[in-house]
């Protein structure tokens, strides 16, 4: 019996996007880097977990650097040259991710911290007792 041929979906066309926005969400447990165009359509993304790190190693600066480098390379294949960077969260990989984006060859035009800070909003969870 002959094998059924696989149907492949339409190939994603390469966009030519010269500038965009990189969102770096850095928590204590992971770092997620998302690169989008100016309208907000995602061009590439990577996280410490998707870069092959597991468990507590996902929260390290090196894992954030690897994730940012991976996302930057994929964005540069789409023609990305300039970036605005929005950094969010208290994690260890904030600065290393920005340096990795610069090191990959992207020109950073703006760095903005968009970490949400409550103006006395919800009651925080109770303190941990270890």
Curated annotation (Swiss-Prot):
SUPFAM superfamilies reported in the protein's UniProt record: Translational machinery components (SSF53137)
List the transmembrane segments. Answer: none
Task: List S-S links within the chain.
Answer: none
Q: Which domain of life is it from?
A: Bacteria
- Cross-referenced PROSITE patterns, in alphabetical order? RIBOSOMAL_S11 (PS00054)
Annotated GO molecular function terms are: rRNA binding; structural constituent of ribosome
Pfam hit, one: Ribosomal_S11
Protein keywords: Ribonucleoprotein, Ribosomal protein, RNA-binding, rRNA-binding
Question: GO biological process annotations for this chain's record?
Answer: translation
Gene Ontology cellular-component terms for this entry are: cytosolic small ribosomal subunit
Functionally, this protein is described as follows: Located on the platform of the 30S subunit, it bridges several disparate RNA helices of the 16S rRNA. Forms part of the Shine-Dalgarno cleft in the 70S ribosome.
User: Quaternary arrangement and interactors, per the entry?
Assistant: Part of the 30S ribosomal subunit. Interacts with proteins S7 and S18. Binds to IF-3.
Q: Which family does it belong to?
A: Belongs to the universal ribosomal protein uS11 family.
* Name of the molecule in the record: Small ribosomal subunit protein uS11
